[in-house]
């Protein structure tokens, strides 16, 4: 009997350790900026990958240690495509990103650095929830941990991007939803005219009783109420896409995943029905057994020119690569069986028809 209990405990611990995720790198216009999840990087990273479950916690702003600046700030311009890269442990091809049971929405907020770090001025600039039987997290896993936004046409200055996952596998009980977030340090070098609105406070934007936080993914439903404020209508006013800049002085770290991917890509087959088994060990924050991400090499700061999308001998664009968008000058005809899907005005992508 003791042996049986021991095996069950080990299985639960292993399952629990494979549940969680952090943002470990970003890409700018398809160029890998290298690992940023360290004190010498550009992401204000927590000490481990544990989620937050108390929506009133001060750590909801930028996660644990999120008030502490890190060494680097990445230069970006209006119209740049920013891709966030999430992982469970590290950036290796074998990493499982986040447990597939952790279905839920993904959102991105933006705030001026000083104001945002104090928990104020957060403006939602992107969100993805539930559509056609798939959750944003399903698409994130299929896309090897990547989802993208476009930099709005805001005034020049220092800003924080705050990508966030809400895992709802225990959202059927009050206080069970799990929140994962980090803050990425950027400096907008273009000088746009669309100043951010007043925004919301985080903590403060969510309540444990919000329909999109206290939500049962295992019962029948046809839609999902996104939590928090609406997406800012100025988020789509991103100005002109940037011209290529000089290559980085250091060779960027390149992963096996494609370099130009948006959030809604390469879907996996999922349903709203309950899975055969769910995590039984995800509860209060202090109870998690987690793994601290392995140290990564320091990041580069200057983006390089975007590589053209791979093409067939006929000149058509392969699946998952860019086929259009504002200021895009490459091939626009997708391979047979694919269509050019517009995700936003700056990024169109070849996907299966």
Curated annotation (Swiss-Prot):
The protein in question is named AA9 family lytic polysaccharide monooxygenase A
Tell me which cofactor or cofactors this protein depends on: Cu(2+)
Q: Where is this region: Disordered?
A: 266-316
Q: What is known of its domains?
A: Has a modular structure: an endo-beta-1,4-glucanase catalytic module at the N-terminus, a linker rich in serines and threonines, and a C-terminal carbohydrate-binding module (CBM). The CBM domain is essential for binding to and subsequent oxidative degradation of polysaccharide substrate.
Q: Which organism is it from?
A: Aspergillus clavatus (strain ATCC 1007 / CBS 513.65 / DSM 816 / NCTC 3887 / NRRL 1 / QM 1276 / 107)
Q: What role is this protein assigned? A: Lytic polysaccharide monooxygenase (LPMO) that depolymerizes crystalline and amorphous polysaccharides via the oxidation of scissile alpha- or beta-(1-4)-glycosidic bonds, yielding C4 oxidation products. Catalysis by LPMOs requires the reduction of the active-site copper from Cu(II) to Cu(I) by a reducing agent and H(2)O(2) or O(2) as a cosubstrate.
Q: What is its EC number?
A: 1.14.99.56
Here the segments flagged for biased composition (Low complexity) are 266-276, 291-304
Cellular compartment(s): Secreted
The chain's disulfide connectivity reads 62-183
- Keyword Nucleotidyltransferase attached: no
Q: What's this one used for in biotech?
A: Lignocellulose is the most abundant polymeric composite on Earth and is a recalcitrant but promising renewable substrate for industrial biotechnology applications. Together with cellobiose dehydrogenases (CDHs) an enzymatic system capable of oxidative cellulose cleavage is formed, which increases the efficiency of cellulases and put LPMOs at focus of biofuel research.
Which reaction is catalysed here?
A: [(1->4)-beta-D-glucosyl]n+m + reduced acceptor + O2 = 4-dehydro-beta-D-glucosyl-[(1->4)-beta-D-glucosyl]n-1 + [(1->4)-beta-D-glucosyl]m + acceptor + H2O
Q: Which InterPro entries match?
A: AA9, AA9_LPMO, CBD_sf, Cellulose-bd_dom_fun
Which family does the record claim for this protein?
Belongs to the polysaccharide monooxygenase AA9 family.
Segments of skewed composition (Acidic residues): 279-290
Main EC class the enzyme belongs to? oxidoreductase
Where is the secretion signal located?
1-19
**UniProt binding sites for O2:** 169
One BP term from GO: cellulose catabolic process
GO MF annotations, alphabetized: cellulase activity; cellulose binding; metal ion binding; monooxygenase activity
């Amino acid at each position: 009997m003791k042996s049986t209990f021991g095996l069950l405990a080990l299985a639960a611990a292993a399952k629990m350790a494979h549940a969680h995720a952090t943002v470990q790198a970003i890409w700018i216009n398809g160029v890998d900026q290298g690992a940023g999840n360290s004190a010498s990087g550009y992401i204000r990273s927590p000490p481990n990958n544990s989620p937050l479950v108390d929506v009133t916690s001060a750590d909801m702003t930028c996660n644990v240690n999120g008030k502490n600046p890190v060494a680097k700030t990445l230069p970006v311009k209006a119209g740049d495509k920013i891709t966030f890269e999430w992982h469970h442990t590290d950036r290796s091809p074998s990493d499982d990103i986040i447990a597939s049971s952790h279905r839920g929405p993904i959102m991105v907020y933006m705030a001026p650095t000083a104001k945002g770090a104090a928990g104020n001025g957060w403006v939602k600039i992107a969100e993805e929830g539930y559509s056609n039987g798939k959750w944003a997290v399903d698409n994130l896993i299929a896309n090897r941990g990547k989802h993208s936004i476009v930099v709005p046409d805001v005034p020049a200055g220092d800003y924080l991007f705050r990508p966030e996952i809400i895992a709802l596998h225990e959202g059927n009980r009050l206080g069970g939803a799990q929140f994962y977030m980090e803050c990425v340090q950027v400096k907008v070098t273009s000088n746009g005219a669309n100043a951010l609105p007043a925004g919301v406070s985080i903590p403060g934007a969510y309540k444990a009783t919000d329909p999109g936080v206290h939500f049962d993914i295992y019962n029948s439903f046809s839609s999902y109420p996104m939590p928090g404020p609406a997406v800012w209508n100025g988020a789509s006013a991103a100005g002109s896409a940037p011209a290529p800049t000089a290559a980085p002085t250091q060779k960027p770290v390149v992963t096996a995943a494609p370099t130009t991917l948006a959030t809604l890509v390469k879907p996996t087959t999922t349903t709203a029905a309950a899975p055969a088994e769910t995590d039984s060990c995800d509860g209060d924050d202090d109870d998690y057994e987690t793994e601290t991400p392995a140290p990564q090499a320091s990041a580069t700061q200057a983006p390089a020119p975007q590589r053209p999308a791979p093409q067939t001998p006929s000149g058509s664009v392969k699946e998952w690569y860019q086929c259009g968008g504002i200021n895009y000058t490459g091939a626009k005809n997708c391979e047979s069986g694919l269509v050019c899907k517009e995700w936003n005005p700056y990024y169109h992508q070849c996907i299966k028809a």
